Amino acid sequence: MQAEDARYLKRKVKGGSIDVHPTEKALVVNYELEATILGEMGDPMLGERKECQKIIRLRSLNSTTDIAALAREVVEKCKLIHPSKLPEVEQLLYYLQNRKETTQKAGAKKGELTGKLKDPPPYEGTELNEVANINDIEDYIELLYEDNPEKVRGTALILQLARNPDNLEELQSNETVLGALARVLREEWKHSVELATNIVYIFFCFSSFSQFHSIVAHFKIGALVMGVVEHELKKHLSWNEELLKKKKTAEENPASKRDFEKSTKKYHGLLKKQEQLLRVSFYLLLNLSEDPKVELKMKNKNIIRLLIKTLERDNAELLILVVSFLKKLGIYVENKNEMAEQQIIERLAKLVPCDHEDLLNITLRLLLNLSFDTDLRGKMIKLGMLPKFVELLANDNHRLVVLCVLYHVSQDDKAKSMFTYTDCIPMIMKMMLESPTERLEIELVALGINLACNKHNAQLICEGNGLRLLMRRALKFRDPLLLKMIRNISQHDGPSKAQFIEYISDVARIIKESNDEELVVEALGIMANLTIPDLDYEMIINEFGLVPWIKEKLEPGAAEDDLVLEVVMLVGTVATDDSCAAMLAKSGIIQSLIELLNAKQEDDEIVCQIVYVFYQMVFHEATREVIIKLTQAPAYLIDLMHDKNSEIRKVCDNTLDIISEFDEEWARKIKLEKFRWHNSQWLEMVESQQIDDGEGGLMYGDESYSPYIQESDILDRPDLFYGQTGYEDGEMYDGQVTPEYVDEYGNVQNGEYLGRPASAMYGNRYQSEYESLRPGSRVAYLTEDGQPLDEYGNPIEVYAESVDQYGRPVTPTYQYGSQAQQGPGYPY
C-alpha cells in the first residue's frame, strides 16, 4: 500500500470474548474488524464492521500439560488476546484439560455432513496483519526478488488478492507476476515449504475456474506440483525412518529420551506444514483433472500411487481430498485395476468407520465404486468390513450409500450366507416395515431381494411375524418389488414354505384381478414355487377360474415373455397333481403349449419349462395317453433331444425315456433317432464316400453296384449295420439268415443261403463255373485251361475258397473285431 493511500483507509481491530470450542481442544477468540474510508480532510466517508473468529487449536494439550505456561504462550502468540486476559485463558485451558470426551461409537452418531470439499486455509505461518491492495501488485512482484522472508511475505500478499475471485482477471492480464511466481516455485520450492505453499495456493485459485486452466498449463504448474508432491512423500518416509531410529535409541538409552521427545515435537510441526502443502497441491491437480487428457497425463505419472501413499496420513481434510480424487479416477477400469494392485481396500478399511462425517461418506462412495469389482468385494469381506457396513445403516447420513454397497456384496452367493451372522436382516426388516412411503426405497428392497435368495436368510426373515407383516404390506400397497422378495422366500423348502398356504387365496386373487403386469408376474412366481404335497391345486384353479385365463395367456403374442414364462411354470407346478393334470389336458392346454413351443423355440427358458410340463404330464397315467396318442408332443421332444441347452436335453431325455416305456411305436422312433444322432458323423462319411465313388468309377450313368445311399433309407441297409460287406456268409451268430438281408441281397434255395447275387456289372459276363474266379480290377483275360492272367500276362493266384465281387476271399465266420471298426456303432 502506498503511503498516500494509507491516509484514506483506516483499519481497527477490537478484541472480544474468548470461549472454548464445543467439540475440539481449541479456544475460539471473537473479535471485531472495522474498516473506514476517510476523505481528503480526514473525515470518515464509508465504514464497515465485521464480526470475526479465530480458532486456536491446542494439539499438545493433555493431562500432563503445564496450563500456566501454555496460557502465556497463547497470549504471546495471539495479538487478539490482551495480556490482561491471561487468568481467563488459564481457566479455559484448565476446563479443556478436564473436559471428558464423548465415547459414542465412531460412525454410529449422526454428525454434520457438508457433502463438499472445503477450500484449504491460508498457510498459518504467513498470516499478515496488513491488507493487500491490487494497486500495489508491482511492489509485491519486487518482493519476489528479495531474500526468502520477503519472498514469503510477497507471495502471501499476492495470495490475499488471488483468493478474491474479482482480482483473478486482473492478475491474469499481468504476465509478469505469474511468470515470476512460476519461476520462484520452479527454482526454490525445495528451500521453503511456506514459499511453495503460498505459490501453489495462488495457482490453485486460478485452477478453481475452468477459464483460467490455460494459464496454469502455460507455466506447466501441474507437472511441477506433481514433482513437489512426490518429493514431499519421500521426505516424509525419511522422517519416519529417522524418528523410528531415535525411538529405538531412547528405549535402549533412557538419557536420550528427551532428545526423542524434542524430535517428535519437531516432526509434528514439519508434518503439519507438509500436509498444508500436500492438500493445496492435490486440490490444484484435482481441478486440472477436469480435462480427461490432463488426467491421463497424471495417471501416466503415477498420481494413483501418490494418492494411495497419502492415505497413510491422519489429517481428515487432506484425506477427504485424496479420497475424492481417487473416487474421480476410479470410474475408469484401468485406474481401478491399478488401485487394486496398490492394495487400496486395505488402506480404506481403517477409515471405516471414522469420526469425520464427510471423510466417512466420501470413503463409502469410493468403496461403492470399487464394489462393482468381484475381487474387490471379496477383499472387503475378508477384511471384516461387512459388520462395519451393517453398523452404519443406523446413521442416516450414510444409510443410502451403505445400502448400495451391501447390495453389491449380496450379489455373491458366498457372501449372502455371511449376512446371517450380522444384524443386517433385522435392521432392513425394521426399515421396510416402518417406511412412511407406499413404495420402499429401491436400494433397500433390492438388498432384501438378494438376501432372500439364501435359505438361512429367508428363515430369519420369516421368524416371528416377519412373513405375515411383509405380505400385509405387499398386499396393501401392491408393491411388485416387495412381492419379488417374498417370491424368493417362497422358493426355499422347509417351514417357511408352509407359511404361504395362508396367503394362496390372496396371491391367486392378484393373478386373476390385477392389471399390474409386474405384480401378476411376481404372484405367479409365488404360486409356481409352492410345491407342497398336500396342496389341492385343482380346487384353487377351479375356485378362481384360472384355466381360461391360463389358456388366454398362452396364446402366442397375448402377453409379454416374462408373464408367459411364469404361466408355463405355474402349469408345470399344478401338473404335479393327478387330477389337476387331467383337467389341464382335457382343456386343451397341451396343444396351446405346443403352439407356444413353435412360436418361442428360440427362448430357451420358455422351451425348457414347456418340456418340463410335458414331463409332468407323461408321469401321470391319466394324462400320459393324451400326450402320446392325441398330440405331437413326443415328436417335438425328439426334435429337442439334441438341443444346445444342456437343461433342455436333460429334461427331454427323461421325458422320452418314460414315453418309450409305455409306447412301442414311439420307442422305436426314439431309438432310431438316437442311432442316427450317435452315428451321424459316420453316416455322413459313408454317404460322401459312396457319392465320390459313383462319380469317378462308373463308365455309364446307369451302372450301379447296389442302390445308392440317397436312393433308399440308410437304416434299411443291413450291410451297413453289420460291416462293409454284411454277414460274409449270410448267417447271424445263431446260424439263421436275417430275413431282411436275404430279401434284398441273397438267394435261398431249399432253405439254404446261396450267397449274394451277382452284381449288375458282372452278372451276365461269366458262367457259374467261373463264379469262384470272379475277376477283380486286375484281371485281363483267361487261358485255355482257365488260368486267369492280368493285363501284363502274369498269372493271378486262384483262391480255393469263394471270393466276393472284388476278388477278396469270403471269411466263413463273422470277424467281430475287424468289422466293428468299419461298421457303425450303436448307442446302447
Swiss-Prot record:
For the biological process aspect of GO, one term held by this record is: cilium organization
On the tree of life, the source organism's domain of life is Eukaryota
Task: Please give the Pfam families that the UniProt record associates with this protein.
Answer: KAP
> What does UniProt give as GO cellular component?
axoneme; ciliary transition zone; kinesin II complex
TM region positions: none
The segments carrying the ARM repeats are 332-372, 373-411, 577-611
Keywords in alphabetical order, please.
Repeat
Tell me the first and last residues of the signal peptide.
none
- Recall the GO molecular function terms of this protein's record: kinesin binding
Alphabetized PROSITE patterns for the sequence? ARM_REPEAT (PS50176)
Gene3D superfamilies in alphabetical order? Leucine-rich Repeat Variant
Q: What does this protein do?
A: Binds to the tail domain of the KRP85/KRP95 heterodimer to form a heterotrimeric kinesin-II complex and may regulate the spindle vesicle targeting of this complex.
Q: How does it assemble?
A: Heterotrimer of a 115 kDa subunit (KAP115) and two kinesin-like subunits of 95 kDa (KRP95) and 85 kDa (KRP85).
The name under which this protein is listed is Kinesin-associated protein 3
Query: Where does this protein come from, organism-wise?
Result: Strongylocentrotus purpuratus (Purple sea urchin)
Protein encoded by which gene: KAP115
